[in-house]
Each structure stands twice: as structure tokens, then as C-alpha cells.
Amino acid sequence: MEKMRGHVLAVPFPSQGHITPIRQFCKRLHSKGFKTTHTLTTFIFNTIHLDPSSPISVATISDGYDHGGFSSAGSVPEYLQNFKTFGSKTVADVIRKHQNSDNPITCIVYDSFMPWALDLAREFGLVAAPFFTQSCAVNYVNYLSCRNNGSLTLPIEDLPLLELQDLPTFVTPTASHLAYFEMVLQQFTNFQNADFILVNSFHELDHHEEELLSKVCPVLTIGPTVPSMYLDQQVKSDNDYDLNLFDLKEAALCTEWLDSRPQGSVVYIAFGSMAKLSSAQMEEIALAIGNFSYLWVVRASEESKLPSGFLETVDKDKSLILNWSPQLQVLSHKAIGCFMTHCGWNSTMEGLSLGVPMVAMPQWTDQPMNAKYIQDVWKVGIRVKAEKESGIAKREEIEFSIKEVMEGEKSKEMKENAEKWRDLAVKSLSEGGSTDININEFVSKIQIN
């Protein structure tokens, strides 16, 4: 067996938005001579489509819900506690399994939502690095909230002017979000004791916020974690995310349809793998987009929320509704004019990295703050204004926002800014770029001497 420079065990939080970026980081490490093993819970392993040719090894661990996953847990706190109990035991089993091999595990890269993994790393004498899947700005606000025992004072010094509506939702928790709020705060309980802090961003994008975080502890930005083919092309065969929780049959249909559309003419609408819009909000979107050519991804579980008879009225020559789309292929297609997004960090990074202006419709978690930066800091889009009482964005506001991004007074500026961020993303990952330097620093310090 080939002796590698070291062996990194990557332990993501078990949801697709956390699994994907840490897996992409594994590909970068593998390209630099490291063996990488990526853990997946048994339930997720049994439900994903995994590329068998991937160079990344997979090890299964347990969250205590091997047959039903998160949805079979009685509550969020129950799931998190059982994941800690069963996860720490089964991750330890993975480490022991490799101890006497030619490539024993030397480092754990773990999701920042799992601070218990640091204790596990120390128990086995391993290098440890939490992986923060959100932006430097969001991480800094969450850190301040933790430092101040869950409270924040606005405005926040050294950050753009933030209003309550711009803050991550877990910073102002409701009873239903309390477990998530505690999970967000727990990221910072022991992170200063780790050997490295890894953040899925790139220096040029939020260098000021990176500097603020670095005053607390040293930070290495190692993003964007978008497949190399779309950016720097340094990692061979890194053409896509190579795992997905959804059926891939519609990919060819999607690409074929986009090929038939004029350049920059299509509004791409997608709200990620978890966001659940109300029926009222789905109706407002449906009524707002009738004058546009659009590709709208509506998960099968959300279809019942569409207005009665709406699907029958869609002009199939001009528009397309699918349950799933190959998002990177879509965003990189010349037919796409803008991206209407929930502003999850992965989707936001994809939009920025592929140079696509955005219509921001944040739902929860870090998304409101990402939307703030999309509009006011990176200047690549517009945030759709929702009504204060209902929280619903009305059809007129949605239609106006799409028009502004597609053809409004600032449309040209937004497109130019989007292209600028795309170029900077490519530069950061290319040889000698900020992210490339940071990854090289990381691997030089964890390699076996």
C-alpha cells in the first residue's frame, strides 16, 4: 500500500449542506498526497448516490438512528444528544481500526457543530481542526453572541450596519429554535484549543471579517469548496460533488432544456435541500414569475404547496419545473440570467464562484446575513423584502426584484461584480492564491515527518 503524507479523518454534521463542503476539502487534501476518510452516518450512506470512482474513502458511523436518520428522532435535542453518544463511540472505532495500518489517522477535521470531536482527537493524540461551514461574518456574529452569553448589541462594531432582520435567526432564538441556538453557541466552547480553525470562504471575499475572527484565534480560509473543474481545474477529475441525496434522472432533461434558451434569459429558482416555504409563499412566487422564462426546482415534498392547477398552466417551451437539478451545471450555463436563492452558504458560494447575480429570499439560520452581504457588501443582487407581520414576500415585490437584477438600472453593475467575485474565487484556489497558500500551510503542519 502506498505510504501517504498523512491520513485525515473528516467528520461532517449529517446533513447535505455540511457533508458536501467538507468532502470537497478532502479532495484538495488527497490531491496534495493525503489519504482521506470521510464519515457518513449509516442512514445517509444508505440513501445517497455515491460515485464509486471517488478517491475519498468512506467509513460509516452511527447517530443512533441508522434506519430513519434525523426525521425519526423524537426532537432536535434528542437527536443531538444521541449523535454525540453514538457518534463519538463509532468515530473512535474508525480511528482504532486504522491504528495499526500503513496509514493510521493523524488528524481529524470535524464540523464545528460537533465540539465533542475535539475531545476525541485529544484522547487519541491527533491533530484537530473544526471546519466552519458558514461565512467569516456569520461565524464572527455567532462568536460575539457566545461571548456575551447569547446576547448581541446593535450596531456591531467593525461590521456593516446590521438590523435585526439581517442577523442569523439562531442569534434571536424562538422556543422552537432553542436547541439549534445552543448548538451554534457550543461551536465556540473549546474551538480555541484546536490546532487549526478552517472556514469555508476565501480571503478576498470577507477578508475584514476574517481578520476580526483571527484576533480571537488563527483562521485558515480554505474555500470556496466548489468542484475544481468549475474554477481552478487543479484537482483532476473533480467534476462534481460526487454524492447526492436526490435522484439524478432529471439532469439530462435540465441541460437539454437550458441549451434551447437564449443567453442570460432564464431565472433559476432553487431553495436548497431543507427550506420549507409556506403554501402562501409558494403561491406568491408562482404568481410573480409568469412573465419570465424560469427553471424552478420544487422538491417532491413541496409540490402540494403549489397553487391548484398551476403546473398545467406552465408554458413548457418557456419554463420548466423539476424536483431536482444539477445546480452547478445550471449556474454555469450561459442561459442563466439570475439565481433566486434561499441564500444558504453553499448556494451563495456557488452563485458567487460562478459569477451569477442573485435574487435573495432568505428563510432562516445564516441566510438573512448572507442576503445582507449579497445586496450591500458584495453588491451582486437584491434582497426581496418580506412583509413584517406575515413574513411573506408578495408577488409584486418578487417580480420587481427579479426585473431589477435581470434588466434594472443596477443590473450591469451586479453582473460585473458577480464576474469579479468569480475571478477572485478562481484566483484564490489557483497556485499561489490565498486559499492554495492556506491549504499548503495546513498540510505542511499535519504531514508525517
What are these regions (language model features)?
Residues 1-449:
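Glycosyltransferase specificity loop/lid
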